[in-house]
Amino acid sequence: MIRARPRLAVRGLLLIENRLLLVNAWPDGKSDLLCAPGGGVEAGSSLPDNLIREFHEETGLTISVGEPCLVNEFHDPEGSFHQVDVYFRVGLIAGDPMAPWTDPEGVVTERRLVTRDELADLRVKPDSLAEIAWDGGIFYDPLEPILR
């Protein structure tokens, strides 16, 4: 099987009043999987610039980008998909994450703030998300199968 080159993406961890911002980026609610906001990297832009753009597209919020905190890899073992996500800690510059918001592109179906306890009852990726978001440090999650 011919494998495609890995897709590079960036994601941001935003904590507001000790709650983590997550999104469901599955149009029409095809999945209940939640993740940190972000998306694919465009050539010619820095990772932080890509994250600022993608975070705004998925949440309507403007952020500042801090230090990287995680490199996470996932793939489809039966296909050619392989993605590498670089996570950064981010801060809120503008916008209200608690206000109702609708994605004008219809990709993000949910944007919500969750506590660490609430996160334990949700389907999220990566598995180490709580540890990374609340405990600090820098992490690497080895290649894991994609969830849908």
Each language-model region and where it sits:
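Conserved N-terminal beta-strand and adjoining loop/helix that marks the start
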Residues: 1-21, 71, 89
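Short loop segments at secondary-structure junctions
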Residues: 17-19, 26, 91-96, 116-118
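Conserved Nudix-box catalytic region and its N-terminal flanking loop in Nudix hydrolases
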Residues: 16-57, 61
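Active-site-adjacent beta-strand/loop module that shapes the phosphate/pyrophosphate-binding cleft
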Residues: 74-98, 112, 133
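Residues that recognize and position ribonucleotide moieties
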Residues: 6, 13, 34, 61, ...
